[in-house]
Every structure is written in structure tokens, then in C-alpha cells.
């Protein structure tokens, strides 16, 4: 009986630990959806609230250099935001520590600059940190997911 209890405990205990991980990951994935919905709806007050108060680090998908730390404001978002709608596809979250979650996903849609609409497709990685009890964006890196390049998409890319 002792061995059955021990085996059951060894199998069950790791599940309890993993559940704590999954909770933070699910919270961040929910915040990620809220963040991009706010960006698409030009709700910059929500966007700014979901970014770190101490500033965020970013890299754009246009091939430019890394951006310096930026403390954003509603006014900055109004001035710099591209129009259009982008959607989050295949988001994955991995909790790195108690207060840091790494996220990666694809973003696709249409963006508009100076009334000119363009297709948009990029890979995104983000680090979310817990500040004052809430998950917020600390860093985001967008890298072009162009069609072609060094890897040609093939059916096996979509296999589980």
C-alpha cells in the first residue's frame, strides 16, 4: 500500500506544479488578446495600461535597429499607430519564472499608412512581466515572416 501511495504521489504532484504554470500562461494569453484588440480598436488607454510603466523594449519587423526603452503614452500611440487590423495566430506562452512569461505567435492582417493598405505578416516574440499584480508587456520583437526566403513553406510545417 505504501508503494501505491508513493507512486500515486509522484505522478500526481508534478501535475499540481504544472497547473500553477498554466494559470500564469493562460492569464498572459488572455492579456495578449486584450492588448491586440485594444490596438486594433485604437483604445490606446488600454494599450498603455498593458505595457510596463518602466518602459518597453521593441524591435520592428522592418529590419531597423532595436529601439531604445520607451515609456509610451496615449498621445504617442495616437501619433505613431498604423491603421488596419492585425490578428494573433498560434500563440504559445511559456512561464520562465514567477513573474516572467515568454510568448510567441504570428501576426497577420492589413496595415494602413498614409491611406495605403498593405498585407502584414510577421513573427512576434514578447516578454510579459508581472507588475503590481498585473501582466504587462516588457519587450516585443517583430521579425518579418516573408513568403520565401531561406525556408520554403511545405506541408510538413503544419504537422503537429
Where are these regions (language model features)?
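Short, low-complexity N-terminal intrinsically disordered segments enriched in polar/charged residues
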Residues: 15-50, 156-160
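Short beta-strand edge/turn micro-motifs at domain boundaries
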Residues: 121-151
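Hydrophobic pocket/interface hotspot
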Residues: 35, 46-48, 55, 70, ...
